[in-house]
C-alpha cells in the first residue's frame, strides 16, 4: 500500500481547526389577546440570516384581517409573505432575508402594530431577542 497517499508529508504546516458554522434555529413565542406570535430566527455565529414572523389568529375582527391582507400585499425585495385561511382563523407569515437591506415597512406599520408584529432590521440575535421584550418565551 502507498503510505504517501494516506499521510500528508508536509509536517511543518500548522493545524487549522474546522470552525463550526452550523445554523441554529431559535423560536420565540407570545400569546396575545388576538392570537399567537412566533418569531423563528435562522442564526449563524449570532447573526440572523433569516427571520420568519407568524401570527396565528384566535380572536380577531375584520379590521385585523384587513391588516393581515395589507401586510400580505407588501412588495419589497428580501421579504416574502403568506396569508392562509379566512378572516376568522387566518395565519399571516412574513419572512425577512437579512442579507438584503432595502426592505421598508413604513407603509404597513399601523397594520403591524394592530397585530402586535414587530419587523426589525436588527441582525444580532441577542439584540433582536431583547428588542422583542420579556413577554416572549425564547428557546
Feature locations, PLM:
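Subset-of-secretome marker
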Residues: 6, 12-139
